[in-house]
Amino acid sequence: MKTLIINIKELLQVRDNHIDKVSGTEMGVLPKIDDAFLLIEDNLIANFGSMSNCPTIKTDQTIDAKGKIVLPTWCDSHTHIVYAGNRIQEFVDRIKGLSYEEIANRGGGILNSAKNLNQTSEEDIYNQSKVRLEEIMQQGTGAVEIKSGYGLTVDGEIKMLRVIKKLAANYPIKIKATFLGAHAFPSEYKENHADYINLIVNEMLPKIAAEKLADYIDVFLETGYFSVQETEKIIEAGKKYGLIPKIHVNQFTAIGGIKSCVKHEALSVDHLEIVTNEDIENLKGSKTMPVALPSCSYFISIPYTPARKMIAAGLPLALATDYNPGTTPSGNMNFVVATACIKMKMTPEEAINAATINGAYAMGISQTHGSITKGKSANIIITKPLTTYYEMAYSFTSNLIENVFIEGKII
């Protein structure tokens, strides 16, 4: 099937050659073509350019995008959208003054989600999760990483990962699965960390590998959760099964986690609300992508990732939602992009780069997603008529998306 989109006001994120990511000052450059066309053949980008060079060919569908912006779909590299129930009461508790840590110490937080999940059938979890997945697709997300981590038992973690696998099989959106058994210590292991880590290493990982349920491995490396040493043991065990690390780190404290993650060649380090000068030096020249989660900072009123400091140091940066029931019950990447501009002082160019090509890198798919490049997946957003692409951040609560293509088809 051939689809030709013509008269595009601004075609964004055009890259003639494949690139993995953009860093530092390059993040402020967003290549675009004004008055452009885009040709989709089957599920791939076949051609693009200025309307003056638009080919005269027979197509199955022609779309006039006069006045509209076209760009790649968002690549959301950090989510927890497979879960059961909600944590609305904790939302009210925070309003009344309780901290994240205080809620967790009272049996809330991750352990609350684990309790809900383990009491819910796999079918019910799938049915709840697919609604969230369909919603984020309509909001322009064309690739998503989904974590386990609300099982915290062998059966619970396997159940979550099977749901993720089923979602990937039933929907056109690109899905990457991450095993996050080390999300928190279950209450019965609170005083016996070694036994829970052994459960992850000796029972969870072999079963996950046998069913090929995960691409990545994650750990919540944070004070009160998993230490650097505990994290390293889990990372090393995961690597034996081919699982690449993508790590939660520096959300509340800096305890040397980033240095460890870089040493172990983590694909990404995520959260980074607290970043030291030493952390920045450790990230320089590495293959590890820093990932900011601004809607989490917004929702639970914690600091924002210091994007300006990191970009000025020459680092790359990706943006993701952290969609989860406790601290970010939203998967709207449009809000993430706008919040990055408003609260983190990223330019629209930087934010769009962070949410497309760098987001693709942070989930290992930048060779097929994240830019308008010949041969890449035809995952694109067509906006409503706009004055400029800056409006995508400026009109931060408006739905500016008219159509979303995933794998060459309007969803």
UniProtKB/Swiss-Prot annotation:
Binds 1 zinc or iron ion per subunit. InterPro entries: Amidohydro-rel (IPR006680), HutI (IPR005920), Metal-dep_hydrolase_composite (IPR011059), Metal_Hydrolase (IPR032466). It comes from the Bacteria. One of its GO terms (cellular component) is cytoplasm. One of its GO terms (molecular function) is zinc ion binding. Transmembrane segments: none annotated. Keywords: Cytoplasm, Histidine metabolism, Hydrolase, Iron, Metal-binding, Zinc. Its cofactor is Zn(2+); Fe(3+). 4-imidazolone-5-propanoate binds at residues 87, 150, 183, 251, 327. It holds the Pfam family Amidohydro_1. N-formimidoyl-L-glutamate binds at residues 150, 324, 326. Catalyzes the hydrolytic cleavage of the carbon-nitrogen bond in imidazolone-5-propanoate to yield N-formimidoyl-L-glutamate. It is the third step in the universal histidine degradation pathway. This is Imidazolonepropionase. The gene is hutI.
